Amino acid sequence: MTRLPLGSSSIDIAGPTTNWWDQINESVQWQDGIFYSLCASYALVSAVALIQLIRIELRVPEYGWTTQKVFHLMNFVVNGVRAIVFGFHKQVFLFHPKVLSLAILDLPGLLFFSTFTLLVLFWAEIYHQARSLPTDKLRISYISINGAIYFIQACIWVYLWSNDNSTVEFIGKIFIAVVSFIAALGFLLYGGRLFLMLRRFPIESKGRRKKLHEVGSVTAICFTCFLISCFVVVLSAFDPDASLDVLDHPVLNLIYYLLVEILPSALVLYILRKLPPKRVSAQYHPIS
């Protein structure tokens, strides 16, 4: 009785399905197409943030640099830098020493952290004011935490510049993951608190419902994106096949940056698109 070569047929079937990922990753055309698409996406989000900043400034120029204006300015900068990085991806991923490539890829991520934790600071101030709690130390805490993060990361880069050590590079990735986890906790803590406080507010109004939707949506989006970032960075620290710092992982880069930065930025900018009300002149008195 003749035996059928089941092993070879299963390999023939599995081969095309397992190789398409490698074929895309190793294709220069696919690499260029994906990274230039990321460049265009970041440039679009950056332009939207700049347009919104200009609209706010034209609407209320007398308010100075409010949290809302700073948030949109930082969004413009972060997404603009990412667009430039991916526009010159061939040079960025192949920099020598390697620490230059790591720094250029990681710095926008730290700026993204600073940009979105600005919302956490804003919500914390609102929550503390509503609870009659002191707010004077909140901004100091925000600046101190960000300053400490940039200082530690700079020390890691300087060490890698002088001594390209795989252990220190591993520590650097874990540090970035911890930073993302801190941001996720910040949104869960203060976004969640503010959301629950608004839900318990006794007076029902259209403004309350809008603010409830705004806080809930932004909290869910930002908590999710920072948690995904934490998970992927930890995974890449232990598994080289999940690394984001190489040219031949374009599909992984596309999925990661879409989920972690581009879509969250676009959605939050859309949710926070409402312009602040114009200041009523002191000389104007409405007809009663």
From Swiss-Prot:
Residues 1-33, 97-101, 161-169, 239-250 are extracellular. Residues 55-75, 123-139, 191-217, 272-288 are cytoplasmic. Disruption phenotype: Reduced efficiency of intracellular multiplication of tobamoviruses (e.g. TMV-L, ToMV, PMMoV, and TMGMV), characterized by a reduced accumulation of viral coat protein (CP) and reduced amplification of TMV-related RNAs. It is found in: Vacuole membrane. Pfam families: THH1_TOM1-3_dom. TOM1 inhibition via RNA interference constitutes a useful method for generating tobamovirus-resistant plants. The chain crosses the membrane at residues 34-54, 76-96, 102-122, 140-160, 170-190, 218-238, 251-271. Keywords: Glycoprotein, Host-virus interaction, Membrane, Transmembrane, Transmembrane helix, Vacuole. Glycans are attached at N25, N165. It is a multi-pass membrane protein. One of its GO terms (biological process) is viral replication complex formation and maintenance. Its main location: membrane. GO terms for cellular component: plant-type vacuole membrane. InterPro entries: THH1/TOM1/TOM3 (IPR040226), THH1/TOM1/TOM3_dom (IPR009457). Necessary for the efficient intracellular multiplication of tobamoviruses, probably being a membrane anchor promoting the formation of the replication complex. Constituent of tobamovirus replication complex. Interacts with TOM2A and with the helicase domain of tobamovirus-encoded replication proteins. Belongs to the plant tobamovirus multiplication TOM1 protein family. This is Tobamovirus multiplication protein 1. It comes from Nicotiana tabacum (Common tobacco). The gene is TOM1.
